[in-house]
Amino acid sequence: MASHILVLHGPNLNLLGQREPGIYGTVTLASINQSLEALAQELGVTIECLQSNHEGVLVDAIQGALGRAQGILINPAAYTHTSVALRDAIAAVALPTVEVHLSNIHQREAFRHHSYIAPVAIGQIAGFGADSYLLGLRALVNYLQQKANS
């Protein structure tokens, strides 16, 4: 059975392409999702994408992934630095999770340097624009394949 990956996009990512293009680029969220779908097919996995500006919706999606998905790819956006709830949900479901960011959060304002998600993720990819998502999906699928073969 092919692996199923839950892809979560946090607050304000619905505005990609128009929001602060100097930081986040001009690629839209729809375009990122299309690229992820194409890569998922190439890698032999399925994905389900969800964007929400609401923390509880994201928590519900993470909890709902239990028994349905083998991994989570998440850009928590601003919730990276504030959400113990997302961190606890990821820890609770114990699914391999990769955290991604379009910008390099460690080169930005000091308050963006801390991630509540990173300690419960298998890895973090930041600073490669929309490619961060593709790199994250590749890394997650590779991790799942290695785990299945061990």
Swiss-Prot record:
Pathway it works in: Metabolic intermediate biosynthesis; chorismate biosynthesis; chorismate from D-erythrose 4-phosphate and phosphoenolpyruvate: step 3/7
Domain of life, source organism: Bacteria
Enzyme class: lyase
Residues annotated to bind substrate: N75, H81, D88, L102, S103, R112
InterPro entries recorded: DHquinase_II, DHquinase_II_CS, DHquinase_II_sf
The keyword Cytoplasm belongs to this UniProt entry's keyword annotation: no
Listed EC numbers: 4.2.1.10
Residue(s) at site: Transition state stabilizer: R19
Catalytic reactions on record: 3-dehydroquinate = 3-dehydroshikimate + H2O
Catalytic machinery residues: Y24 (proton acceptor), H101 (proton donor)
One Pfam family it belongs to: DHquinase_II
A GO MF term: 3-dehydroquinate dehydratase activity
Annotated keywords: Amino-acid biosynthesis, Aromatic amino acid biosynthesis, Lyase
Role played: Catalyzes a trans-dehydration via an enolate intermediate.
Sequence similarity: Belongs to the type-II 3-dehydroquinase family.
Cited PANTHER family: CATABOLIC 3-DEHYDROQUINASE
Assembly and oligomerization: Homododecamer.
Identification of the protein by name: 3-dehydroquinate dehydratase
Organism annotation: Thermosynechococcus vestitus (strain NIES-2133 / IAM M-273 / BP-1)
This protein's encoding gene: aroQ
